[in-house]
Amino acid sequence: MKIGYPCVNETLPCSAAGTFRLASYSEERLLTTVASNLACLRQILEWNVSQGLLFFRMGSGIVPFGSHEVNTFPWQEHFRADFQALGAYIKQHDMRISFHPDQFVVLNSPDPSIVQRSIAELVYQGSMLDLMELDSTAKLQIHAGGAYGDKDAALARWTDTFHNHLPDAVKARLVVENDDRLYSLRECLGLHERTGVPILFDNFHHECLNHGEPMHEALRLAAGTWHPSHDGVLMMDYSSQAPDERKGKHTDTLVPELFESFLADLNGLDVDMMLEIKDKEASAVRGAQLLRAAGLLPPMPAGYEVPVFADRPAPAPPKKRTPKPKAPAAS
């Protein structure tokens, strides 16, 4: 089992997502920004290793405009050695890496231009995993997409795009996540049957949208879509409901009681767990402590000290909802 957090480390004084406006694009600016992003990414990975956090989702913006037609510079060749060095470090420490392209990546859009741009973005992000020389257990995570008034037709378009338009290198890395509004675990299982794509399981989305499958059963159904040799163990996202907020809003910080209750649902299932929680690495460190206490992670080396996140703002208190005043009765 591995545990981690996505994209941004709020402890370190650097960003791996530096960018600039399209209007100010230049090769010089691109090179400077990518070099800075890669240097920060190395710092993040080293910090994660020091804390035993061996699952990390890299941000999509390492190379600004990486899939945009304006970017014609051969950045893959220019930064090949840098990516290879990152990959060597990742493999040395048995880390697992993923990307989660932005919501504009939609494979079942009825607009062919959106699908074309989505494929270009997947190719770009997959190429970074290839440059790091990571095997196919490093994944590209997307949602099933929209329904567009006809979910069956939308699923058919997704299937057609997968089989007939995606490069094999992208297919080997692609996983689909159950969401909280449109495509449940059951519908993602249907996509798996049509395409073989593994399902990245999101426990919180399953709580929001399901067909009555208990959590322990849902976990095993999703895990059964992953091939041990070329997919690895089940990747999953973990979060819980933010108190007194709209349904589906993620919690600001890890709630130990809910996390421990979820661990019971695993019942021995091996997973790599991404915490989609607002305070990022702070919750990941706390989650790792709970996993060690449960015997699910190895102990840290002698002398390890748990970091203190005292400079973090406290989670916002629940919003007080004041009822709207009633309109005066008609006289």
Explain the meaning of each model-derived region.
Residues Q103, D180, H205:
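Short, glycine/acidic-enriched loop or turn micro-motifs at the edges of active sites
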Residues L140-A156, R246-D252:
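Glycine-rich phosphate-binding "P-loop"
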Residues Y183-S184, F204-C208:
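Short acidic, Gly/Ser-rich segments with clustered Asp/Glu that frequently serve as metal-coordination loops
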Residues G146, V176, L275:
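Conserved short-loop catalytic and cofactor-binding motifs
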Residues I97, L174, I199-D202:
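Residue-level marker for buried hydrophobic side chains located in beta-strands
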Residues H192-P198, F204:
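Active-site segment flanking the S-adenosylmethionine/decSAM binding pocket
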Residues D152, V175-L182:
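Domain-core and long-helix interface of multi-subunit machines
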Residues M1-R96, Q103-I119, V123-L134, A138-K139, ...:
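Alpha/beta catalytic barrel-like cores
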